[in-house]
Amino acid sequence: MDSGLRSLLSDHSRYVESFRLFLQNSTEHQCMQHFIETKLPDIISSIGNDKPVIDVLGIGSGSGEIDLQMIAKIQARWPGVSINNQIVEPSAEQILGYKERVAKAPNLGYVTFSWHHQTSSEFEHRVTEDKQMTKYDFIHMIQMLYYVKDVPGTLKFFKSCLAPNGKLLIILVSGNSGWAPLWKKYGQRLPLNDLCLYVTAGDIAEMLSSMGARFQSHELQSDMDITKCFIEGDKNGELLLDFLTETCDFRKNAPAELRDQIICDLKSPRCSTTKDGKVIFNNNLSVIVVEAD
């Protein structure tokens, strides 16, 4: 890593600001929502067979926007069945946002919510220590495997938490997205800081295959307008550049040679396309659905 570079995750408020800007400028949530509308009903069609309560576990659920859409699909498939929704989220700010979202949401009468202010590894440690392993019918890990230290171990643990007919749903950047060449080329020079791993869905599929897990993959097309990243002094452009590199104040703190290389590569066909004067980054995602043993 180049000295002087600090992980974006070390400045929580700047990370949250840059992440919100990323969502505004990308089709990330829209493509997830389309997947939930069109594909999720089939995926969850058998998770609640003959069960009085459906147990759901969200790992790194953020403020709950995507969670509640998935809960709605489970409710539609199993009307009147109680849902026990456990949420593991390390950000107190995001948990507060989730609780506010639940308070305003209609039709949650059969759903109970429990929030755990923890990382996934802290949750795993507590469950293992207590020796009280709840089995879950549906577990989801959306855009969070970058932030665990032991990815294979995490996959193995949460797969072991699945009930019969249970499903583990993972969403991560695709191996053919613009993120993949960026991380492959510059990962060693950007601030991992033990806080972020440059891992794609392709890496996850290899790990699952080596474990002998049964899974299916779905590709989601997504893009992000990064035009402002190339306008020096543009505040939103600086924040998006921070998000793309996971680096705090990247333009100001990165060595000139590294900064210029990355800015050049962000415009290259490996990462982006140019359309109507805008630079559109390839933000494609993959959904991996892991079956219970």
UniProtKB/Swiss-Prot annotation:
Main location: cytoplasm
GO molecular function, one term: histamine N-methyltransferase activity
Catalytic EC class: transferase
GO biological process: histamine catabolic process; methylation
InterPro entries tied to this protein: HHMT-like, SAM-dependent_MTases_sf
Cell compartment(s), UniProt: Cytoplasm
Entry keyword annotation includes Ubl conjugation: no
Keyword hit for S-adenosyl-L-methionine: yes
A Pfam family reported for this protein in Swiss-Prot or TrEMBL: Methyltransf_23
Residues that coordinate or bind substrate: E28, N283
SUPFAM superfamilies, sorted: S-adenosyl-L-methionine-dependent methyltransferases (SSF53335)
UniProt catalytic activity: histamine + S-adenosyl-L-methionine = N(tau)-methylhistamine + S-adenosyl-L-homocysteine + H(+)
Keyword annotations: Cytoplasm, Methyltransferase, S-adenosyl-L-methionine, Transferase
Positions contributing to S-adenosyl-L-methionine binding: G60, E89, Q94, S120, I142
Listed EC numbers: 2.1.1.8
CDD domains, alphabetized: AdoMet_MTases (cd02440)
Gene Ontology CC terms, in alphabetical order: cytoplasm
Functional note: Inactivates histamine by N-methylation. Plays an important role in degrading histamine and in regulating the airway response to histamine.
Protein name, entry field: Histamine N-methyltransferase B
Chain's gene name: hnmt-b
